[in-house]
Amino acid sequence: MIRGKIDILVVDDDVSHCTILQALLRGWGYNVALAYSGHDALAQVREKVFDLVLCDVRMAEMDGIATLKEIKALNPAIPILIMTAFSSVETAVEALKAGALDYLIKPLDFDRLQETLEKALAHTRETGAELPSASAAQFGMIGSSPAMQHLLNEIAMVAPSDATVLIHGDSGTGKELVARALHACSARSDKPLVTLNCAALNESLLESELFGHEKGAFTGADKRREGRFVEADGGTLFLDEIGDISPLMQVRLLRAIQEREVQRVGSNQTISVDVWLIAATHRDLAEEVSAGRFRQDLYYRLNVVAIEMPSLRQRREDIPLLADHFLRRFAERNRKAVKGFTPQAMDLLIHYDWPGNIRELENAIERAVVLLTGEYISERELPLAIAATPIKAENSAEIQPLVDVEKEVILAALEKTGGNKTEAARQLGITRKTLLAKLSR
């Protein structure tokens, strides 16, 4: 690493100490940013990629250990050095356990500081943990679960290549976020990232969007238009819901991928294009191939590198971090002083199955913030389907029959709606007839 290209974030609520460190580190050739609180540090880490964080332990609002853990959740690869005026073994051990690379005793020995900085940055290079050109947190990819770490590792491995990527996952799992992270971490990051949802357009419109059209090619084509392939030339083209395209479009897309050239609608001229293609789908394309609905040759072209998106229920340990992330965003947007969640509300969020995944969680938190009149989000502000989630003791050896679980949810919904069966059924997403049938079992 060239020092002039290394960005260091100093986190300390002592303004004078921050200023001294900034002058010192800049004198050594580093770029330095300052944060006077843990919350300020997190905001900066979300917006910018830092090569190293130097963080004080004792801070008023959010201490250094808590800040360290939150930063690691946002970007596990970033090296963090802890500063403490208290040379207790307990503090050092706690910091190292939380993910700190090393710790420094205040007042700082500047020679020791310089040596520790150089070792930390060298360690980053040696372990191959050179930070990508953009932090995962910038794209909303938040979490420290094994599933999330596996996904981030896949992104780091795949991004340097030009191999076509197929991202598979349920709706709301963040497939476009992964595509954006792949592009940002690739050698094409300074070139365009062009996105298109294939399911949102009919066949003729999709053809025009992908390949462009000549003036007069069809009714309404009053001028020549370049397609998404040409717009993405030199960069990345992300095609979402690729499993929804028609057989004719499958043929045209296959040709574009194989030949690396496209033709505008209404033209015989071919245009060479250089794009990194990333596709995504919620469908099982192997199953679609077996059923004759998707071309096998196109499937093999797309599925060079496969990335499987974990559902939110497969990484429940990330829910508190995600919920807090959305809470801060919507609290700021709505100008509300929200402090957090009640323990009961967080339990409900963790135990709910999230069929709509991260998108559903985001919507639920936005709704809760809008409805909130106090300082903490409780079960009252959560959507009924979540508030009615039964929470069983984790150590319970007995598996409760599904019919009993359904009845518990329905009874909770009825209690919340004052016994109104029609409203309870509506909020649970079932018909009144189904609700009555399940109650009578």
Swiss-Prot record:
Domain Response regulatory: 7-121
Residues with 4-aspartylphosphate modification: 56
Main location as per UniProt: cytoplasm
Modification after translation (UniProt): Phosphorylated by ZraS.
GO biological process: phosphorelay signal transduction system; regulation of DNA-templated transcription
Localization (cell): Cytoplasm
InterPro entries: AAA+_ATPase, CheY-like_superfamily, Homeodomain-like_sf, HTH_Fis, P-loop_NTPase, Sig_transdc_resp-reg_receiver, Sigma_54_int, Sigma_54_int_dom_ATP-bd_1
DNA-binding annotation, residue ranges on this chain: 421-440
Protein name: Transcriptional regulatory protein ZraR
